Amino acid sequence: MALLQWMLENISDDNSIKMSLEEQHETFQINVKWLKFLNLSDSDIVQLQNVYKLVQRDRERLIIYPDPQNVHSWSYLCSPEEIKVIIVGQDPYPDGRGHGLAFSTVRGCSPPNSLKTIFAELERTIENFKAPAHGSLKSWCAQGVLLLNTVFTVIRGVPMSHEAIGWQVLSNRIINQLSEKMQNLVFMLWGSQARKLVSLIDSKKHLILECAHPSPRTKGSKTPFIGCGHFLKANKYLQIHNKCPIDWNITNDL
């Protein structure tokens, strides 16, 4: 309630604001190709401006992850028309290891526990997969895997601290537009937060894969991550629809 009151008192709600794609790019630092694809409404733009004001307010007094230049790095590593698989995460790692890609870390950082679980499932199902010592998943992005958090920033040391500031206006739009405009995509929804997005996806056009979050804290779930087989299922679906499967092995050249 305190956050909502602050927003009402300090942030303009001028729905008459018009922004060109170039202005949106300068303001939000999202790739222009994605901005064209998303076709944000005036209302979306105003809400995003409000989110950015809140993030900037926090940056002035706290440490916020990731750095501004990496908040939307997802939009620069694969174009909308290249997307084949969408893996939905929650929010950035609160220890600074992230770089704007769900579950991925900067090179030189060891994989967090959730990513170790992901690697364990890959080792279980993908022939010759070997877990790397680092946690960068950029090589997946180069093949059309969108690693998308539903919340794009976080206060250092406080997981989900920016969950309530409004980032979902963007992440929901991304999911919705991919579902509407594309065909035969694979959506991997891991955990309760990601599974809330299922209503935004047309199951007649796309494959939706759901299971527990790979965090060790979800051990014992009715739909555990280990054993989900999502990576194999995704590749089989892509091949059925005449798309190249994903090479899930983590390369060392990115």
From Swiss-Prot:
Pfam families: UDG. It is an enzyme of class 3 (hydrolase). Its EC number is 3.2.2.27. Keywords: DNA damage, DNA repair, Host nucleus, Hydrolase. GO terms for biological process: base-excision repair, AP site formation via deaminated base removal. It catalyses: Hydrolyzes single-stranded DNA or mismatched double-stranded DNA and polynucleotides, releasing free uracil. The keyword Hydrolase applies. One of its GO terms (cellular component) is host cell nucleus. It comes from the Viruses. One of its GO terms (molecular function) is uracil DNA N-glycosylase activity. It is found in: Host nucleus. The keyword Transit peptide does not apply. The active site is at 91 (proton acceptor). Transmembrane segments: none annotated. Belongs to the uracil-DNA glycosylase (UDG) superfamily. UNG family. Excises uracil residues from the DNA which can arise as a result of misincorporation of dUMP residues by DNA polymerase or deamination of cytosines. Therefore may reduce deleterious uracil incorporation into the viral genome, particularly in terminally differentiated cells which lack DNA repair enzymes. This is Uracil-DNA glycosylase. It comes from Human herpesvirus 7 (strain JI).
